[in-house]
Amino acid sequence: MLVAGLVGLVGVGVPAVAFLAEYGCGEREERLGAVLARESVLGAAPEGARQRERYRGCDDDDRRVVAGAAYRYGGSAAQALRHYGGAAPAAGWRGTDVPGCFVKEVDGTTAHLAVEGPKDGELLVEILADREASALC
């Protein structure tokens, strides 16, 4: 009985150890985040927008990387979308069927640029990517 229990534990434990070794953000995600953060479109704000913060990070669960900028902006969503409809393609981004969503190959994966808002006077411009090339907007 003890031997069977140990065999069962070892059988379950090996995949769990492999999973834990693969869990979380690492050097590849850090490098991708640095590349995304340098994308010029993050600094291409509409007229009248004031940058509040720049940020980047990685979600350990799915290793999704984000780099973004938050702006104080008094304009409308239509004005913001119109602005990025010109600024994003000028920086190499392609439009999609989703308003405010653009795609571009960055560091060997497909990155998604999302323009959100303004909501409560805040405009978010984010680039999201993962090594699985997931559809992110």
Which residues make up each language-model segment?
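An acidic-aromatic pocket/loop used at catalytic or ligand-binding sites
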Residues: 1-137
